[in-house]
């Protein structure tokens, strides 16, 4: 998925669309998109890896994260930062909660191991 596709997905989640359901390609979103995208991209990259982050240089660059993160987590973080930049308090509150819950699910383990200490 490219940065442009991610931006459109986030703007659609926020409801920042035209009467025909098309996302707004207004300059105010495009000019902030790289910063917004790289902020969330770096945050999510480091939940999976300890190094090797390469920031997006333009909106046509591919975002190198797992399919799950691209479809289920990152759009909510990008939407959160766009809402913040628009001073859209209701959407900011909603997408902050959703992003943080979804991000937390990435770092929790898939299974729980019971450990019982025994005297030596």
Model-predicted segments: where are they?
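Exposed alpha-helical structural elements
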Residues: 5-9, 91-94, 98
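Elongated alpha-helical scaffolds
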Residues: 68-77
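Short, residue-level hotspots on alpha-helical faces of the histone-fold
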Residues: 39, 76-81
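Short, mixed-charge aromatic SLiMs
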Residues: 97-111
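Short, mixed-charge amphipathic alpha-helical segments
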Residues: 59-69
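Conserved short "hinge" loops at termini or chain/domain junctions
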Residues: 1-61, 107-120
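Short helix-capping/linker segments at secondary-structure and domain boundaries
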Residues: 81-92
């Amino acid at each position: 998925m490219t940065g442009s596709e991610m931006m459109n997905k986030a703007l659609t989640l926020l409801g920042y669309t035209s009467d025909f359901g098309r996302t707004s390609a207004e300059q105010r979103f495009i000019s902030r998109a790289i910063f917004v995208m790289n902020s969330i991209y770096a945050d999510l990259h480091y939940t999976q890896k300890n190094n090797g982050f390469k920031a997006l240089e333009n909106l046509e660059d591919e975002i190198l994260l797992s399919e799950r993160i691209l479809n289920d987590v990152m759009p909510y973080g990008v939407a959160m930062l766009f809402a913040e930049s628009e001073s859209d308090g209701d959407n900011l509150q909603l997408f902050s909660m959703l992003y943080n819950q979804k991000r937390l699910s990435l770092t929790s383990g898939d299974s729980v191991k019971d450990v019982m200490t025994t005297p030596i």
